[in-house]
């Protein structure tokens, strides 16, 4: 049975949506050069997670400055050509199949869907990314599943934004919790995403388990230490592989400003890495690298203090962040096995690197020898779960 390489990263949203999508293109090419099959990127990566913003809102009042801030945030969201749909569910499979309206040949939206499909197709990487989607005057915190062969297989919208997120994001319908399925090198992978604190909703988790998923994706904005424990619980509970991705975002202050440096290498159109000559002005290198299994290795320093050159595999770039940096979000992306073992990460304070792990999806079946949360262990003769607008039929392996 072929192994599948799962990968994730902790990049931060760029100043413009076009720049963020261009970054996805770059990350996908790097992922392809590292032979990653499926890549997860963070919650709200396209459009941005407005951490710390209040949008001028308080109980009983909204400011003009806040309205303008929201208008600018709205501009950064992408239009994927979907409808609002019942309860915020969109058009579902009609959107996937481009069957909205009378003419299926008409391109809907702002072209973001087509660009993401191109990136997946060119890189050969199955991409799952968080995005802020706009339609009908509302914003949704969404996730798209982009297959390199078939394009977008599905899209879902966060059913309950957390806390103050409800000021700016509408509720998505639970019908969008539909899992999708793909086959990579003969391995059937059933995957679905739970966004951030949806992972603290037991019935939502059970909704995903009930569709017989073996890959559970958790894009998030939570960088608390407790998050990894939750991901390990999900792995054991669902007997599935779990991939989580969160942005690593440095705090931009006069004392701690991210200084963007050039890369140690570049990726050609064919996916080959070309090492670039080292600039004499650069003296700092990474403190760690990741090996072929996705494990982090701490690098030693020379006694005389000269760091020297860095050679890494997979392609790793010189850190763009000063040592004394404060972080708005520390990242923490990780990959967990069906037995709750952390097989890659957590990736802290590293917006540039990739982490990955080679996995055997038959481990999900082996784990169900003693625990099948959506099978006999669910005791569905005694406990009933129904989801509005969604049939909980298990996908085949």
Model-derived regions: residue spans:
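Catalytic metal-binding/acid-base residues of hydrolase active sites
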Residues: 45, 132-133, 200, 221-223, ...
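Active-site catalytic loop in hydrolytic enzyme cores
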Residues: 105-118, 122-125, 133-215, 219-233
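N-terminal active-site segment of His-dependent metallophosphoesterases
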Residues: 1-38
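A generic structural motif
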Residues: 12, 53, 159, 249, ...
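Hydrophobic/aromatic beta-strand patches that form the interior of the parallel beta-sheet core
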Residues: 7-9, 40, 128, 217, ...
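Cys-nucleophile CN-hydrolase/nitrilase-fold catalytic domain and related Cys-dependent amidase chemistry
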Residues: 17, 29-149, 222-224, 228-236
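Short beta-strand scaffold segments in enzyme catalytic cores
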Residues: 129-131, 141-145, 178-179, 244, ...
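C-terminal beta-strand edge segments of enzyme domains
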Residues: 247-397
């Amino acid at each position: 049975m072929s192994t599948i390489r799962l990968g994730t990263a902790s990049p931060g949203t760029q100043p413009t949506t076009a720049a963020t999508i261009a970054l996805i293109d770059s990350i996908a090419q790097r992922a392809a050069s590292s032979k990653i099959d499926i890549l997860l990127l963070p919650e709200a990566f396209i459009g941005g997670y407005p951490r710390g913003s209040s949008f001028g809102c308080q109980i009983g009042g909204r400011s003009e400055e806040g309205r303008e801030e929201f208008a600018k945030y709205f501009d950064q969201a992408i239009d994927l050509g979907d409808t609002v749909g019942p309860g915020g569910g969109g058009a579902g499979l009609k959107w996937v199949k481009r069957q909205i309206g009378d003419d299926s040949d008409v391109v809907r939206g702002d072209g973001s869907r087509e660009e993401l499909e191109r990136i997946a197709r060119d890189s050969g990487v199955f991409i799952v990314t968080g995005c802020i989607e706009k339609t009908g005057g509302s914003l949704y915190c969404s996730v798209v599943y982009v297959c390199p062969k078939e394009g977008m297989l599905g899209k879902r919208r966060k059913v309950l934004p957390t806390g103050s997120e409800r000021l700016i994001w509408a509720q998505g319908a639970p019908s969008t919790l539909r899992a999708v399925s793909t086959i990579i090198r003969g391995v059937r992978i059933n995957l679905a995403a739970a966004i951030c604190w949806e992972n603290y909703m037991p019935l939502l988790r059970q909704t995903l388990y009930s569709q017989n998923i073996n890959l559970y994706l958790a894009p998030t904005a939570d960088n608390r230490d407790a998050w990894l424990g939750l991901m390990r619980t999900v792995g054991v509970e669902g007997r599935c592989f779990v991939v989580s991705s969160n942005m690593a975002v440095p705090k931009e202050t006069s004392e701690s400003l991210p200084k963007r440096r050039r890369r140690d290498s570049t990726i050609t159109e064919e996916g080959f890495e070309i090492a670039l000559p080292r600039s004499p002005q650069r003296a700092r290198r990474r403190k760690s690298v990741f090996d072929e299994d996705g494990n982090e290795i701490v690098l030693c320093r020379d006694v005389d203090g000269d760091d020297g050159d860095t050679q890494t595999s997979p392609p790793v770039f010189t850190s763009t962040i000063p040592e004394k940096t404060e972080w708005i979000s520390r990242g923490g992306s990780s990959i967990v096995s069906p037995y709750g073992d952390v097989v890659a990460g957590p990736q802290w304070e590293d917006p540039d690197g990739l982490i990955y792990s080679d996995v055997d999806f038959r481990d999900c079946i082996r784990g169900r020898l003693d625990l099948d949360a959506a099978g006999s262990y669910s005791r569905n003769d005694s406990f009933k779960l129904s989801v509005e607008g969604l049939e909980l039929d298990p996908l085949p392996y």
